[in-house]
């Protein structure tokens, strides 16, 4: 009997296990990345964790997530490509959220040509994120660009922080229903300020395909993340 079919099944399980392992690694480091606004009564404990052994930091992290009601995803909880972003290191997922926000602001971003602005941009999304933005912004989108000229966000990009942009990217992806509301990406919400307000210009903006385009092109834009799409 040929072993072809079982091999395919094993590969699928192995890939899903890798996604779950990435999520678990994030969970065990939650004390390092959960935004301070979520710490609540555990804030004194979290504040002391940097000086403790990894096992104790992991225990604190899991306690923090349980207190906050973070999900425990199953192997099939990563079926949607966007849900698999929860398996990336949280810092990388936040960079990607900023890329999504900056795509929305691509018209404004075209004026960011001085050295200081480019360095700030690289700090937000990294060198690979800058390359991804350049590639995506070069796609044929003249009608979108003209449309954006008439609905620039009221808060200028220069006044935004990294957290602000990650939150804008989160809201844009959520508006597009990119991931399951009860899925693994809920954990990433904890990396953003608890009381972040919904940006009215995002809520009122016309629908676009930027998020879907970004997700579809992730394997070519970020080859090191190809394991997410195995």
Language-model-detected regions and their locations in the chain:
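General marker for long, soluble alpha-helical cores
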Residues: 1-230
């Amino acid at each position: 009997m040929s072993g072809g079919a079982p091999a395919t099944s094993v590969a699928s399980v192995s890939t899903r296990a890798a996604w779950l392992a990435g999520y678990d690694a994030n969970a065990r480091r939650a004390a390092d990345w959960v935004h301070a606004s979520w710490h609540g009564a555990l804030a004194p404990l979290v504040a002391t964790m940097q000086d403790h052994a990894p096992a104790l930091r992991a225990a604190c992290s899991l306690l923090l997530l349980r207190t906050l009601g973070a999900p425990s995803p199953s192997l099939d909880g990563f079926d949607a490509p966007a849900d698999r972003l929860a398996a990336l290191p949280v810092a990388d997922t936040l960079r990607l959220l900023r890329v999504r926000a900056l795509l929305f602001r691509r018209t404004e971003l075209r004026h960011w040509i001085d050295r200081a602005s480019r360095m700030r941009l690289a700090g937000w999304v990294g060198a690979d994120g800058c390359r991804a933005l350049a590639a995506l912004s070069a796609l044929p989108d003249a009608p979108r660009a003209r449309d954006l000229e008439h609905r620039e966000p009221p808060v200028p990009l220069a006044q935004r922080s990294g957290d602000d942009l990650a939150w804008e990217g989160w809201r844009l992806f959520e508006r597009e229903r990119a991931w399951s509301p009860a899925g693994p990406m809920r954990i990433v919400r904890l990396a953003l300020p608890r009381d972040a307000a919904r940006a009215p210009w995002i809520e009122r903006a016309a629908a676009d395909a930027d998020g879907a385009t970004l997700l579809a092109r992730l394997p070519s834009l970020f080859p090191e993340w190809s394991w997410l799409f195995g």
